[in-house]
């Protein structure tokens, strides 16, 4: 069924920034004593807010200083300002949604500044969302709670049950399920975590217009 609205995660869905951020994160956590296999870190940390990452990393054994979140954000912003490419096929998806007159928004656990840095590198991209760019950090509860997705649905004046969420993390897929929304899981490499949270996986953004019933 064609959705009435689409809500995108940002990192790893619109902009190919997640690998950049995660490489920096893994290296940084190692300096504070957390040396775990990458697959374990991805399973435990991807999709969380940075405050959530810090809390989880401490439970896993990282000896993080009190100012770690702010310090890491400074390093991350500096790295992302060097360039964060779009996920291939994203503009094709937005063009198809525009042609079908289907509204869309962003619902991310990333900070507003982070999204401004990554999205703002691509001319006209922020404007295409018409102010509908929302951070879970501005909500009462971030993902895996549904607050940011429900807020986005209200902003577009659509029933949550008619929305589709595009996510790449189990945390985000869980939030979509809690919001009563269908989740399409962008999974070019690993699908198990998204499947476990009820997402419908796909591997290429170029396939998404067809999967959404737009063509």
Regions found by a protein language model. Give the residues of each.
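N-terminal helical cap/lid subdomain that shapes the substrate entry/recognition surface
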Residues: 2-10, 14-100, 113-116
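Asp-based, Mg2+/Mn2+-dependent phosphohydrolase catalytic module
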Residues: 1-4, 95, 111-215
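Short glycine/proline-enriched coil/turn segments at helix->beta-strand junctions
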Residues: 59-64, 100-102, 180-181, 196-200
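Short linear functional motifs in flexible/disordered or boundary regions
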Residues: 24, 37, 53, 65-66, ...
């Amino acid at each position: 069924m064609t959705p009435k609205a689409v809500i995108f995660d940002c990192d790893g869905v619109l902009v190919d920034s997640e690998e950049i951020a995660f490489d920096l994160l893994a290296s940084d956590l190692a300096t504070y004593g957390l040396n775990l296999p990458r697959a374990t870190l991805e399973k435990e940390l991807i999709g969380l807010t940075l405050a959530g990452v810090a809390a989880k990393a401490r439970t896993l054994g990282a000896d993080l200083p009190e100012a770690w979140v702010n310090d890491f954000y400074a390093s991350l912003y500096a790295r992302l300002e060097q360039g964060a490419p779009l996920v291939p096929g994203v503009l094709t998806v937005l063009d198809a949604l525009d042609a079908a007159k289907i509204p869309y928004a962003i619902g991310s656990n990333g900070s507003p500044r982070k999204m401004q840095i990554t999205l703002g590198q691509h001319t006209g991209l922020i404007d295409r969302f018409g102010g509908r760019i929302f951070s879970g950090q501005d909500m009462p509860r971030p993902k895996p709670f549904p607050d940011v997705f429900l807020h986005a649905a209200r902003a577009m004046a659509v029933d949550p049950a008619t929305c589709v969420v595009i996510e790449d993390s189990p945390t985000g897929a869980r939030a979509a399920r809690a919001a009563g929304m269908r989740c399409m899981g962008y999974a070019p490499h690993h699908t198990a975590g998204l499947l476990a949270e009820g997402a419908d996986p796909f591997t290429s953004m170029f396939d998404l217009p067809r999967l959404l019933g737009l063509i």
